[in-house]
Amino acid sequence: MTATPADRPDPGVAGDADWAAEARPLLVHADMRLCKRFDQGEPTERLLALRARAVDQLMRNAWTRCIPADAGLSLHAVGGYGRGELFPRSDVDLLVLGETAAQQRHEQALARLFALLWDVGLPISHAVRSPAQCTSAAADQTVLTALIESRPLVADAQARAALAAAIAPQQVWPPRAFFQAKREELHARHQRFGDTADNLEPDIKDGPGGLRDLQTLGWMALRAFGVKDLEALVGLGHVGMDEAAALRREREELARLRYGLHLVANRPEERLRFDYQKTLAERLGFADDPESLGVEKMMQRFYRSAALIRRISDRLLQRFEEQFDGEAVPVQLDAGFSLRRGYLTADADTWPDGDVVQVFALFAQWAAHREVRGLHSLTARALAEVLRDLPAYDVADAIARDRFMALLRGPRAVETLNRMARLGVLGQWIPAFASVSGRMQFDLFHVYTVDQHTLMVLRNIALFAAGRADERFSITHEVWPRLRKPELLLLAGLFHDIAKGRGGDHSELGAVDARAFCLAHRLSEGDTELVTWLVEQHLRMSVTAQKQDISDPEVIHRFATLVGTRERLDYLYLLTCADIAGTSPKLWNAWKDRLLADLYFAARRALREGLEHPPPREERLREARESARTLMQAQGHDDATIDRQFAGMPDENFLRFRPEQLAWQAASLIEVQIGQTLVKARRAVPDNDALEVFVYSPDRDGLFSAIVATLDRKGYGIHRARVLDAPHDAIFDVFEVLPQDSSADGDPQRLAAALRQVLAGDLLKVRPSRRAVPRQLRHFRFAPRVEFSESAGGRRTRISLVAPDRPGLLADVAHVLRMQHLRVHDARIATFGERAEDQFQITDEHDRPLPDAARQALRDALCACLDPT
């Protein structure tokens, strides 16, 4: 493929611009032809080689133009270009080899060469070294890695031999040391990505299971065995034909993704960012259907490729290690299994002989011996070879099912499930789990694939089982010991999202799967019903806590009635905590912990006292006052002071807050006179970033809007706001906030001072700040929805708002409400990835619910403010 102008006598530097102008469109046209062939489905491996060949020709012509034939210099391709692989926007790595004197003598000619190549449009990266300098530079194994894949472009046999000698194992990095360095580098790189490829925006090149892992294996093979590709290791007995074929297939899959990503992004982009995912999926032919988006199919294929590469890579790394260290004397374990250099090995050559019971016996041994480093490569390969022949649970015999349940009831059950999932055994035993393996959801709420999220949920359950207090989960360690059969919670966690992507309600469909599994594994009817109910209702506690007013006895009564028993409540609470915390590292926070704990205790009390006769309002008020009074008395306050402060607090306050919050509010009010403004802030939970802000103030137009705008400007996100009318025309505002960005310093005193300063001024001049929408959020835009309903027995209007999340959203909503002369009485703020789902209870300025005309005017104003288009 010609990509350069014809060779011609060198007219000197003056003609370089004309040469580059002629070469540039030829290179562009070559890329366009390759792009067309890519879209037609030609193998990516061939396209990479053709592009490298086109650039080779340009390089040779440019070299001939700029460098004299007798210069004593040679030109070599290194790195990926040296492998003969050149992606559309990748750097072109070059080495100019020559002795120092030759380098100095032709310094200007080399500068001219590099300038000419840049002028053509090639993103070159170059080094100019002597053989001795190559040896010195190769002390850095990353430099050696680039050099060992060198390919001569303009070099005679002597130059090629000099470079080979300079970086020979006898000179630098013998095979064993190189292997160890590369293995450590691989592990460190994996850790940078959280040791998983299942991120929302994975890195195709450097992420776990990515192209870099395959290249690392190739570098090790080249240094240790002198072979250019992994397929050559088949004949040496280090790689099976099936493994080599699988790696080649997955390499083509990832290379095609990367090639397309470079074209779509028009830059050397290695991460599958949201900016490009949909466009790339369309280009690669992934179409939407009723069950899955095309982009979700593309990402699932990537995640599965990465998982398979990691499985095979683990086996190869272990074999390379054995090549250097030799076979170890086995340490016998129970019958049929032993340890070799810490790796668990099945002793029989015929293991597992298609017997899933033997496979489960392997995992039982793994769980029983903490010293096991992993699975021996021979055993892992034997397992992989028979994996597809192992029966699923619904056709396996009763012995196999009993063995699986024994693993769930045995030690380190969650670790066992993780291992089974990674090795493909769990998906083979439960085919529905295989269906969600690698399945992503194209949103910002679910940051893991469904299978990885499920495993995260199980890990959280294991954390609860440890029985230690954890600052993230305030009461899980207290609830866990009450579980009659912990394995039932594991089953609920395993099945709660297993029906994702089938269409329909995944909770209901998953419950059907869970019931079938439990019955097949001979669980009792009661245990089966509990697991089935947990899967079907696994979202109920989260939705109730985050979207309903759990200080309302009717809400608690409905929830407790649904739950029915203390046992169900215990299991559901733990499953809900594990589920939310396993959805995203940022989703779980102190407020959610406290919210769920409050709902748990309220429901537990309702169940204890009986659902037929919930306590009347007056009794609840009396109990709240007495509990708060006891706390204040312990702080040294006398009854007269307590009575005076309680008289200044609205009755509704005693129904909405816990006794310790009431005591804090009442004690704070001692400092203020009627008509004055009080602002207090404190840490809601010790050693946590969550803050509670209490504002007592004369009612003023724009008060709520000014507070919200100030909190937003100071970098705090509001999770809950409660606004109550107090005696003497005062307002009780309580906000639960968390630092949202780096501008929030987390100091409650400074935040309170900032609010006091704002509230001392003209509230009507306070405006929401303007901030840019983060990159990720820009790709999930949709029209806002505003719905109205009655609340508080018809005395108020409830707004349910669903809109694309963005910085300052709540401040903008509060500003719209102020401009419409509306009063906010309650606000519940919930964010689910890119979606904000907020609820407000409002009235007009005369404390009346909104009529239809006012509702429509408010809807129009909110949509105009929040519509991303």
Swiss-Prot record:
PANTHER family: BIFUNCTIONAL URIDYLYLTRANSFERASE/URIDYLYL-REMOVING ENZYME, BIFUNCTIONAL URIDYLYLTRANSFERASE_URIDYLYL-REMOVING ENZYME. GO terms for molecular function: [protein-PII] uridylyltransferase activity; phosphoric diester hydrolase activity. Pfam families: ACT, GlnD_UR_UTase, HD, NTP_transf_2. Belongs to the GlnD family. Modifies, by uridylylation and deuridylylation, the PII regulatory proteins (GlnB and homologs), in response to the nitrogen status of the cell that GlnD senses through the glutamine level. Under low glutamine levels, catalyzes the conversion of the PII proteins and UTP to PII-UMP and PPi, while under higher glutamine levels, GlnD hydrolyzes PII-UMP to PII and UMP (deuridylylation). Thus, controls uridylylation state and activity of the PII proteins, and plays an important role in the regulation of nitrogen assimilation and metabolism. The keyword DNA-binding does not apply. InterPro entries: ACT-like_dom_sf (IPR045865), ACT_dom (IPR002912), HD/PDEase_dom (IPR003607), HD_domain (IPR006674), NT_sf (IPR043519), PII_UdlTrfase/GS_AdlTrfase (IPR013546), Polymerase_NTP_transf_dom (IPR002934), UTase/UR (IPR010043). This is Bifunctional uridylyltransferase/uridylyl-removing enzyme. Has four distinct domains: an N-terminal nucleotidyltransferase (NT) domain responsible for UTase activity, a central HD domain that encodes UR activity, and two C-terminal ACT domains that seem to have a role in glutamine sensing. It comes from Xanthomonas campestris pv. campestris (strain ATCC 33913 / DSM 3586 / NCPPB 528 / LMG 568 / P 25). Residues 1-332 are annotated as: Uridylyltransferase. It catalyses: [protein-PII]-L-tyrosine + UTP = [protein-PII]-uridylyl-L-tyrosine + diphosphate; [protein-PII]-uridylyl-L-tyrosine + H2O = [protein-PII]-L-tyrosine + UMP + H(+). Its EC number is 2.7.7.59, 3.1.4.-. GO terms for biological process: regulation of nitrogen utilization. Residues 333-691 are annotated as: Uridylyl-removing.
